[in-house]
Amino acid sequence: MENRVKRVLIVFYLLGLVSLFADMVYEGGRSISGAYLENLAAPPVGPALIGLGDFAGYVLRFIAGYLATVYQSSKLLWGFVIAGYTVTAISIPLLAFTYSWSIAAVLYMVDRLGKGLRAPSRDVIVAEVSEDFGLGKGFGIHELLDQFGAFIGPLVVSVSLIYWGYRTAFLLLLIPGAISIVLVISAFTLYPSLKSVDRVKKPELGFKGLGEVFWLYVLASSALALGFMHWAISSYYLTSRGVMSDYEIGLAYTIAMLVDALVAIPLGHVFDKIKLKVLLIQPPLSLLYIVILLYAPRELIPLAAVCWGVIMCSEESIMRASIALIVEPSKRPLAYGAFGLLYGLTWAIGGFVYGFLLGNNLHVLTFAVATNTVSLLLYIKLSNKYEINTSNLK
């Protein structure tokens, strides 16, 4: 028993390190995606194609999650995880050999497909190996390591560009990519059989069994996604209005990422204490972010970045932990896939709406108030319903 606990803990940290090194590759490559496409003489549609890759990745999350739920195979789940990380580890460094903007855009899209393939199964495994010491804490530590890689990757690429150029910058990302593959295979070797899969004798098809609480959670989170402004839109607004320079916007984003990393473990700890009630902080923070962005003096923009960073952290930690809390283990792959698709779709729709309304601050604020208010009310209902269901089981 003691050996199993140690092995599970080792696998947990291995998966965290896998995300760290894989994010060095992904974020390192993404940090210069627009500049690299421009360097290859790409038209404005070039960067937009990368956005299509993000959407395709969300669709693949659902497909991978559905297949993992139907077949209930530990090997299949691990296969999706290993294949997904391998795709990222290869596709981004291959950019070093591209001379066509279209091929470069395709490689960026392929990377997003890799994330879509691995994400639901990875979250299932992280949830399982975190249960002994707390889902919130587990996903919080995982997000902290993930963000550490997201910080180091762009830094390595930036330094490489100064001294050696694009090709060397991309080739250097082969190193963390190779390390991520070795680590994820090591994790599989140590923990090849998932108890959440092996205990299921006959898999259920379809969405039956996800439960009313899960769909209420999806509705609340989708409303949040509609009202949560993407950083790209925010930075466009700040630039077009002359509020901040490019350098200052980049610095504000760095603050957001730093906050994301710093609050990951504390937020996870709070989640383990009060469960779904911690989700209630998100809609007010999302609305506060919009208010500061639109109406506050430029000196307070860093405070907006803090709000944005906390919400992003919650999306990558406690929102993932919430699914593991409210969905039975055998249904988690499908739940993660369905949630990822719907959340990503509504966030994209919200982005288009904000882009359309951006010329009128009052309209932007009205949309933000409406969506975040709905989200808050649904999260309150969700929290109450979860507590009632939990008390009935005692």
Please name every model-derived segment.
Residues 1-9, 191-220:
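Juxtamembrane intracellular "pre-TM" segments in multi-pass secondary transporters
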Residues 3-58, 214-242, 248-252:
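Helix-loop boundary and gating motifs at the non-cytosolic
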Residues 44-45, 132-142, 246-247, 329-339:
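Loop-to-transmembrane helix entry/capping segments in MFS-fold secondary transporters
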Residues 60-75, 161, 263-275, 358:
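Helix-to-loop junctions at the C-terminal end of transmembrane segments
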Residues 78-93, 174, 277-292:
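Structural signature of the two symmetry-related core transmembrane helices
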Residues 117-130, 314-327:
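Intracellular juxtamembrane helix-capping segments at the cytosolic ends
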Residues 169-186, 364-381:
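Symmetry-related core transmembrane helices of the 12-TM Major Facilitator Superfamily/SLC fold
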Residues 275-319:
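C-terminal transmembrane helical hairpin of 12-TM major facilitator-type secondary transporters
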